[in-house]
């Protein structure tokens, strides 16, 4: 049974535990520690990137893991779980839900419809569609996506990057879709999180504001008198 409800309880806060290679906290051991801290703080789920991080987090928590695999494959713009091999790798590492780029941009292997179908039939995992527009969300659900996230709003060439969370897109998705909608992207304050739930989000995903001390420090340092 791949049902989403047995993996996530809504409403909830999902903490994204990810670090780029240039971050001092890069490494599975650090992401596992972040996940444990998030669980202790009351998080209802973890979003994590790559089989090594997913496996390390799986070893220290029973929280649902929303897994993805970022792979930059030239010349393609799609990098969030771009093909079935990536999806299989994070599923085998212990991810409960598989997140993928659900934009219409070219992909290196399977088309979006085939990818979602293979994840369902071969891996028996629910799919979270990361989108940047309402149209992408509608199409993803038509193709079988089990939930939709605003992850890519402002991160595609054809969408405007808002200063904070894209509440307009969130509102549109909530009103149009019958599947759970996850709000993600540029959340920094409790007020923004509360606003997302007021608009009908089933979950809010917060990453940098919780798990990136370097960026948090940079934001605070901007207020130091020069």
Model regions: which residues?
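A short alpha-helix capping/helix-coil boundary motif
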Residues: 11-16, 33-34, 64-67, 94-97, ...
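C-terminal alpha-helical cap/extension of soluble enzyme domains
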Residues: 2-25, 29-32, 165-226
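Active-site-adjacent beta->alpha loops and helix N-cap segments on the catalytic face
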Residues: 24-28, 47-66, 77-83, 102-119, ...
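Amphipathic, soluble alpha/beta structural segments
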Residues: 40, 120, 124-147, 199-225
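Conserved N-terminal beta1-alpha1 strand-loop-helix module at the mouth
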Residues: 1-92, 125-127, 135-143, 223-225
